[in-house]
Amino acid sequence: MQKLTAAQIRETFLSFFIRHGHTHVPSSSLVVADDPTLLFANSGMVQFKDVFLGREQRPYSRAVTAQKCLRVSGKHNDLEEVGPSPRHHTFFEMLGNFSFGDYFKAEAIALAWKLLTEEFKLPVERLWFTVFAGDDEVPPDDEAAALWIAQGADPSRVLRFGRKDNFWVMGDTGPCGPCSEITMYIGDDLSQMRAEGVNSDDPNYVEIWNNVFMQYDRATMQPLPRPSVDTGMGLERMAMVMQGVHSTYETDLFVAIINQIIKTRGSDEEHYHAHRSAYRAIADHARAIAFLIADGVLPGNLGRSYVLRRILRRAAYQGRTIGFERPFLADVITSVIEQMGEAYPELVKRRELILSAADQEERQFLRTLSGGLTRLQGVIEQVRARGEQVIPGNDAFVLKDTYGFPLDLTQKIAAEQGLTVDEAGYEAAMAEQRARSRAAAASKRGGEADLWADLDLPASHFTGYERLSDRATVIGMLGDGDALTSADTGRSVQIVLDTTPFYAESGGQIGDTGLLVGPEGSVQIEDTRRPLPGLIVHYGRVVNGRISVGDQVQATVDVVRRADIQRNHTATHMLQRALRDVLGEHAAQAGSLVAPDRLRFDFTHTKAVDPEELREVEQRLNKWVRADTTVRWEITGYQDAMARGAIALFGEKYGDTVRLVTIERGQTLAEGEFASRDSLELCGGTHVNHTGEIGFVRIVSEGSIGSGIRRIEALTGRGAEGWVEQQAQTLRELAARINTQPAQLLERIDALLAEHRQRKQELEALRSKLAREQLDLLLGRVQHVAGVPLLAAEVEADSVDRLREMGEYLRDKLGNAVIVLGAQINGKPQLLTIVTPDLVRRGLNAVQLVKPLAALVGGGGGGRPEIAQAGGRHPDKLAAAIGAAVEVLAGQAG
């Protein structure tokens, strides 16, 4: 058996199946689109699910992939095992080959045998093969067993197991079938190898590959007409086998990352081995963090974002347990990017975003970690004092809500101290909030989509790319939740046409408005949406006459409004290109709104955009507009578009054919470059034909809308012109108010500000003079208490600093005295006590003087022996407190 690096294993697997007629399909994003049952891709077959279910056709019938996977929730939840286990991970790579009704068991097993024994050169005598033993519903998979033996497997090492281990189902319906797993014995002593070790907890037996044979329909358990194959080989486990180690953390996939943790902390081997679980967990979590952020997930409180937050905060806490006091994850993640960046270029491309987003989240958590740990320790002590072993669920919820502690982190810390957490109570504390969220979501989905589904209408034919007015037939209508055959004047309706030029809200672009004119009436269309895939629904009101199902209508889009929308949509694409040119390729779209009056673009960037950068972005956009370059679109293959550098929206699911919108860069203008390359984006929206149609672009705001997400709002065309006119009018009005011309406005404002500063200084000087005169009058009110000069008085002061200045002025004037001043500042009593140095040496103390006085006004205070101050809640008691200074000083001086 040859030793191979993980990269060599990946390449060997892919190239082997490519040579055997398989199409190499790149890994899909970790973010699974259009599948509410999955947050993340957790196996290689996820991106082919619709192919296996017969919902989607691909131009190939056999494929090979190296798929990014994440398992952190649901049935496939490895999070708690990560660290203590030598082989469990959150993020991992799954190598797989697939047949979509092409080859089946015979070729799949032959290919597997050839790869394992000839390419990887695994020792046959250490390999075990399992097949389905059969049950009352499904016969045993004798075919697979015979095929393994025919390839050369020892019959005694072909074992049979039941459904738990060797039968695969996708769900209650869909394809299912037996699977055949390949296990390798990695123990040092071959004589100890036993059949009982397969599918056991014995660490000497490692499952390296699973071949799933989809041959039955789950609903009927009848054979499928075109059986398929789905296989999965975990790269991490295969690397462990090929590199002769007993833990995936000892492979080249992890060694460099763990070494970086050791280096960053300044650890030694002894410390690593004493805290190995924590080091491993950090290394694993760093990989998950890097890939999640690269695939567009940022830390947050919902869904995928919360999973990332949980993983990152677990890693930060693990760092705390091994001695990290400051943020360290960015250093560790850098090692991940360096190691995995060649195989997954998105890591390099989004390096800045990955590092800054992770560092920002870690710092945010560390600010609350100490307080949370203190709170949790207090809860633990209370639980133990009651003689209990369970942390109440409500306390766990408070830790999450106030300190950002995910439940699993609280459970981990509790387990370290021999306690558990009341999960039911935790869920109960969140139940009301969850119920509200579910109700809101259900209300949003509503029953309209179900009504349209019941009508079973054909998909609408969209003609809005080519024309803005078209003949169409009304094929369906709803009103107030009921199916209608006709509607009269004043009725609000939702209408479906067989053909329509109206664009339905999608991809951030809002829906068209316009008019439907039929033989007996007309409908004002106020919005257009798509409640079901392929179904375009027009929302409007019958403005005259009657509209009926079956009517032939002229459907006309509001052309002025559509033109405004198109200007903003094309400008949105240009804005993304300009942001990437100025800020870096990490500035990727995180959301957008394309409306007739404005555009809004959300993008990934972890700090405010510098005003100079924002100005450069706007300048680039307007140069591009003046260049009047061509905007075109085409239907092309997804892989071809991506190979040409097209930008796809994170988390969006695309078919094999896509619509590619290109905004040409054209020639650099004499006034300078405006784009580094053409803008290429996958987009179904509507656009102008040339950038010059946009007129010009004005960015009106930029700000943060969440962790690592910025938002720009901009105007184009008529909207930008209106904004400029509004600003000009504002300048004219300002100029008129200060009796100048707009061109001299800045100069005039500077002069007014200078005059204001001068008047303010003069006023301040006058106030100081008056204050000193007031204080000088107080000098005559000095009284002697036990031989100590005392000045106690209530004064007027607008701040504590002013009160302090007064006290210091009197101290300097008196030279040898105790001074007690009081003032009402912002409605609250404030006290100041000063003891000159010679009296401090005699034993007097300003702090001891102010505390009893502060108690009289319902407060407290502190300071130094020479000067102290205090505040309180009862301004009506201030005079009494000042009067009590004589008695308090007498007590001290006596």
Swiss-Prot record:
Its cofactor is Zn(2+). Consists of three domains; the N-terminal catalytic domain, the editing domain and the C-terminal C-Ala domain. The editing domain removes incorrectly charged amino acids, while the C-Ala domain, along with tRNA(Ala), serves as a bridge to cooperatively bring together the editing and aminoacylation centers thus stimulating deacylation of misacylated tRNAs. SUPFAM superfamilies: Class II aaRS and biotin synthetases (SSF55681), Putative anticodon-binding domain of alanyl-tRNA synthetase (AlaRS) (SSF101353), ThrRS/AlaRS common domain (SSF55186), Translation proteins (SSF50447). The gene is alaS. This is Alanine--tRNA ligase. One of its GO terms (cellular component) is cytosol. PROSITE patterns: AA_TRNA_LIGASE_II_ALA. One of its GO terms (biological process) is alanyl-tRNA aminoacylation. SMART domains: tRNA_SAD. Pfam families: DHHA1 (PF02272), tRNA-synt_2c (PF01411), tRNA_SAD (PF07973). NCBIfam families: alaS. It comes from the Bacteria. Belongs to the class-II aminoacyl-tRNA synthetase family. Its EC number is 6.1.1.7. Zn(2+) binds at residues 569, 573, 683, 687. One of its GO terms (molecular function) is alanine-tRNA ligase activity.
